[in-house]
């Protein structure tokens, strides 16, 4: 039996890999405008695997780490994380936070974490992670 997540994983990876600039324009037009596309971009799949391989944070679907340059000349890394699911997942905001922090901690580069939630719920749209001690 085929895992439903696997069915969605490969096409999303191919779309991002082959059409990254168009993908960013469609899903993240404001971010797209800030990128200097004339300088190109570089997928950092090996760097991402170094950071997340030991994470015990639940399922990972399509994750891409891409080095781009802002129009200001600043190098930034963009973490694109795509969740394909039909229900809420409580660990998603935490996982995004952990990936962002681990990338920054290991490589000392600013990271923009972007998510495409491809589930059918219009009410579940996590936009932050936090916790309180007191």
Task: Walk through the language-model features, giving the residues of each.
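Accessory alpha/beta interaction modules
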Residues: 1-134
């Amino acid at each position: 039996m085929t895992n439903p997540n696997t069915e969605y994983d490969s096409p999303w990876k191919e779309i991002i890999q082959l059409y990254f600039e168009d993908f960013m324009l469609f899903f993240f037009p404001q971010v797209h405008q800030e990128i200097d596309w004339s300088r190109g971009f570089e997928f950092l799949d090996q760097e991402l695997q170094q950071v997340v391989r030991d994470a015990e944070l639940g399922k990972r679907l399509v994750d891409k780490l891409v080095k781009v340059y802002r129009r200001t000349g600043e190098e930034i890394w963009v973490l694109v994380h795509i969740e394909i699911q039909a229900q809420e997942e409580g660990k998603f905001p935490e996982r995004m936070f952990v990936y962002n922090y681990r990338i920054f901690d290991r490589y000392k580069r600013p990271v923009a974490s972007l998510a495409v939630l491809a589930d059918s719920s219009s009410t579940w749209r996590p936009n932050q992670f936090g916790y309180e001690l007191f």
